């Protein structure tokens, strides 16, 4: 089968033939129906993920159909449509038993220690699998592992209450445009921030209010902002912090430039009673919650474009294109 393989540390990737996967005990083989490109891929290719073991198949977001199940697999059968979490938990530890699989000490990451999903077929551990409801499209389901499920968990950890106001930075990006929808589906009023007048009208389809510009805190403070979902990182963090009303929470998802740092003013966070929540992974519970909202039509996938596996270069060009809105998907 064909796959996108990262050859080594900072050595780029290539599309090449690899052996078809075979399931070991506790594993399944899926046919990849959709995968998704992510800014994290670019950071991995730049060498910012030290746990990567090479060569490795790239890609960590997938929806697929089970073709074959290995020994000991229960609850899943050939023909089931599934997504995978971003990682494989052991399923037995203290955290896994509490439903906090993201904290599992033994977790292994797809496209890091384990082969990812930019391939025609993929091997997935059963502890990672979540069934997709019939009414959820492939496009909506593939958004769950690294986008809608992740945002769902972030807002749950922020104890979002119905009627609160959520501000989303990078609101036209692949994460941001869906974060607006997740927050609204969870009962919030939503404010989207974008730096592009061109994209403001699109963001406005999903947000109650749109702010255009990199300096947005003063405009944001015209109402009480209770939660910020920061999908960008250091370039927007200061404005995000200043946007919050007392008792506010920042859910920090983005980190577009890992080489940059931010000097946090502790007194500011103390006096305003602000909580900063770092966040990167959904659990099974969160994935199921996001899938339910997707199946109900409360979250609609926004797709910037779709490319074939062998057009991966074109896909990354689209991902970097500042004029695109939404996620770039991959088919095989």
UniProtKB/Swiss-Prot annotation:
Gene3D superfamilies (UniProt xref): Medium-chain alcohol dehydrogenases, catalytic domain (3.90.180.10)
Positions annotated to bind NADP(+): 39, 172-175, 194-196
Subunit record text: Monomer.
Family as reported in the entry's similarity comment: Belongs to the zinc-containing alcohol dehydrogenase family.
Cofactor: Zn(2+)
Summary of the function given for this chain in its UniProt record: Plays a role in autotrophic carbon fixation via the 3-hydroxypropionate/4-hydroxybutyrate cycle. Catalyzes the acryloyl-CoA dependent NADPH oxidation and formation of propionyl-CoA.
Entry binding sites for Zn(2+) 1: 38, 60, 146
PANTHER family: ALCOHOL DEHYDROGENASE 1-RELATED, VACUOLAR PROTEIN SORTING-ASSOCIATED PROTEIN 11
Pfam families: ADH_N, ADH_zinc_N
Name by which UniProt lists this protein: Acryloyl-coenzyme A reductase
EC class (word): oxidoreductase
Catalytic activity: propanoyl-CoA + NADP(+) = acryloyl-CoA + NADPH + H(+)
GO molecular function, one term: acryloyl-CoA reductase (NADPH) activity
Lineage of the species this protein comes from: Archaea, Thermoproteota, Thermoprotei, Sulfolobales, Sulfolobaceae
InterPro entries to which the protein is assigned, alphabetical: Acryloyl-CoA_Reductase_Zn-ADH, ADH-like_C, ADH-like_N, ADH_Zn_CS, GroES-like_sf, NAD(P)-bd_dom_sf, PKS_ER, Quin_OxRdtase/zeta-crystal_CS
Top-rank lineage group of the source organism: Archaea
UniProt KW keywords: Metal-binding, NADP, Oxidoreductase, Zinc
UniProt cross-references to CDD domains, sorted A to Z: Zn_ADH5
A GO CC term assigned to this protein in UniProt: cytoplasm
Species of the source: Metallosphaera sedula (strain ATCC 51363 / DSM 5348 / JCM 9185 / NBRC 15509 / TH2)
EC number: 1.3.1.84
Binding site for Zn(2+) 2: 90, 93, 96, 104
Keyword presence, Oxidoreductase: yes
């Amino acid at each position: 089968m064909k796959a996108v393989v990262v050859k080594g540390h900072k050595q780029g990737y290539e599309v090449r033939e690899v052996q078809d996967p075979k399931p070991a005990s506790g594993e399944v083989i899926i046919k990849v129906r959709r995968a998704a490109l992510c800014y994290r891929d670019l950071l991995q290719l730049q060498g910012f993920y030290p746990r990567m073991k090479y060569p490795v198949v790239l890609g960590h977001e997938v929806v697929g159909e089970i073709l074959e199940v290995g020994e000991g697999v229960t609850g899943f059968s050939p023909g089931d449509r599934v997504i995978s979490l971003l990682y494989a938990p052991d399923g037995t530890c203290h955290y896994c038993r509490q439903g906090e699989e993201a904290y599992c000490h033994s977790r292994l990451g797809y496209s890091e220690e384990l082969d990812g999903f930019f391939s025609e077929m993929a091997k997935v551990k059963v502890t990672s699998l979540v069934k997709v409801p019939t009414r959820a499209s492939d496009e909506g389901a593939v958004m769950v592992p690294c986008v809608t499920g992740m945002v769902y968990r972030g807002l749950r950890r922020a104890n979002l209450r119905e009627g609160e106001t959520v501000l989303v930075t990078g609101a036209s990006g692949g994460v941001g445009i869906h974060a607006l929808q997740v927050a609204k589906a969870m009962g919030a009023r939503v404010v989207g921030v974008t730096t592009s007048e061109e994209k403001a009208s699109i963001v406005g389809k999903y947000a109650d209010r749109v702010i255009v510009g990199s300096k947005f805190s003063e405009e944001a403070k015209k109402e009480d902002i209770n939660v910020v979902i920061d999908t960008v990182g250091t370039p927007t963090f200061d404005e995000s912090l200043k946007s919050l009303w007392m008792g506010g929470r920042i859910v920090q998802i983005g980190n577009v430039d890992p080489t940059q740092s931010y000097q946090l003013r502790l007194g500011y966070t103390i006096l305003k009673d602000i909580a900063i929540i770092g966040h990167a992974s959904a659990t099974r519970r969160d994935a199921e919650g996001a899938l339910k909202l997707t199946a109900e039509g409360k979250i609609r996938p926004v797709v910037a474009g779709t490319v074939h596996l062998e057009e991966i270069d074109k896909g990354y060009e689209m991902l970097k294109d500042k004029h695109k809105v939404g996620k770039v998907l991959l088919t095989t």
